[in-house]
Curated annotation (Swiss-Prot):
The lineage of its organism: Eukaryota, Metazoa, Chordata, Craniata, Vertebrata. The modification S-nitrosocysteine is found at residue 150. The record marks 177 as: Activates thiol group during catalysis. NAD(+) binds at residues 11-12, 33, 78, 120, 314. Pathway: Carbohydrate degradation; glycolysis; pyruvate from D-glyceraldehyde 3-phosphate: step 1/5. Coiled coil: none annotated. This is Glyceraldehyde-3-phosphate dehydrogenase. It comes from Danio rerio. Its main location: cytoplasm. Signal peptide: none annotated. Has both glyceraldehyde-3-phosphate dehydrogenase and nitrosylase activities, thereby playing a role in glycolysis and nuclear functions, respectively. Glyceraldehyde-3-phosphate dehydrogenase is a key enzyme in glycolysis that catalyzes the first step of the pathway by converting D-glyceraldehyde 3-phosphate (G3P) into 3-phospho-D-glyceroyl phosphate. Participates in nuclear events including transcription, RNA transport, DNA replication and apoptosis. Belongs to the glyceraldehyde-3-phosphate dehydrogenase family. GO terms for biological process: glucose metabolic process; glycolytic process; microtubule cytoskeleton organization; neuron apoptotic process; peptidyl-cysteine S-trans-nitrosylation; positive regulation of canonical NF-kappaB signal transduction; positive regulation of type I interferon production; protein stabilization.
């Protein structure tokens, strides 16, 4: 099992750790965060307002974070080049600070003994992989990769199924997205993105997202055919993608449902889901899948123009994919 270090113990860092202990696909051996001391790490990992209390045992012992009897080395370095990943036995590093998102910046982890770096965010230059969509294109020559964004992980599997079966001519995506840590609790300054600075719990906030364009990087035949935007809404977790597309091949809505269900039950099982239940956002809190197609929520104007709806736990689904990507990479060593 691949040994992993986590840089940045924020929402994604903690939930990747949680996912790793629940799925046992990778082993967490080290965590670095200059802003959180060991006792605070114990507290933050144990108690979670969104996903509930961690059900196992968490404690500090001998200067290490101990989860379910498993000791994890803790560092508090600001410069990634100074983190001694090698000493802790970590060969892969999850870069989840949100700061070191380019190949050059993320490569600093290699200096401390890491072999590969997985950026848990979109990257301007690192190759992006979405499990179930283009993960087979990964090869051993790559040392720094990106797991793309939570929204790209939701959109890409559905876009792939639709494009493979009916060919997408063009499309627009909106994500109705839960609050994240980058937003403000009350109105405050926010650089050039003035709307983003408005109170998160008080407003529906139109925002930009690169998620749809990023799909063109993971599915090259869709490059230039999709773009999108976001609405930030006052819910703590779980988001939903609305994908409106023009199809080259005519399709009844029932046919679309059929091919999505076949993918969800078959090649994309565990990544793409399918539901005909009368669900709402809370029903997906803690869902491990990347994208759950809501058969009852979509609509068709005609056989060439449809609106498709798919849900995602933007925190936990994504964190599980980070673990899956690392396990896949390790299988290629």
């Amino acid at each position: 099992m691949v040994k992993v270090g986590i840089n940045g113990f924020g929402r994604i860092g903690r939930l990747v750790t949680r996912a790793a202990f629940l799925t046992k696909k990778v082993e967490i051996v080290a965590i670095n965060d200059p802003f959180i001391d060991l006792d605070y790490m114990v507290y933050m990992f144990q108690y979670d307002s969104t996903h509930g209390k961690y059900k196992g045992e968490v404690k500090a012992e001998g200067g290490k974070l101990v989860i379910d009897g498993h000791a994890i080395t803790v560092y508090s370095e600001r410069d990634p080049a100074n983190i001694k990943w090698g000493d802790a036995g970590a060969t892969y590093v999850v870069e989840s600070t949100g700061v070191f998102t380019t190949i050059e910046k993320a490569s600093a982890h290699i200096k401390g003994g890491a072999k590969r770096v997985i950026i848990s965010a979109p990257s301007a230059d690192a190759p992006m992989f979405v499990m179930g969509v283009n993960h087979e294109k990964y090869d051993n020559s790559l040392t720094v990769v990106s797991n793309a964004s939570c929204t790209t992980n939701c959109l890409a599997p559905l876009a792939k199924v639709i494009n493979d079966n009916f060919v997408i001519v063009e499309g627009l995506m909106s994500t109705v997205h839960a609050i994240t840590a980058t937003q403000k609790t009350v109105d405050g300054p926010s650089g050039k993105l003035w709307r983003d600075g408005r109170g998160a719990s008080q407003n529906i906030i139109p925002a930009s997202t690169g998620a749809a364009k990023a799909v063109g990087k993971v599915i090259p035949e869709l490059n230039g055919k999709l773009t999108g935007m976001a609405f930030r809404v006052p819910t703590p977790n779980v988001s939903v993608v609305d994908l409106t597309v023009r199809l080259e091949k005519p399709a009844k809505y029932d046919e679309i449902k059929k091919v999505v269900k076949a993918a969800a039950d078959g090649p994309m099982k565990g990544i793409l889901g399918y539901t005909e239940h009368q669900v709402v956002s809370t029903d997906f809190n803690g869902d491990c899948r990347s994208s759950i197609f809501d058969a009852g929520a979509g609509i068709a104007l005609n056989d060439h123009f449809v609106k498709l709806v798919t849900w995602y736990d933007n925190e936990f689904g994504y964190s599980n994919r980070v673990c899956d990507l690392m396990a896949h990479m390790a299988s290629k060593e």
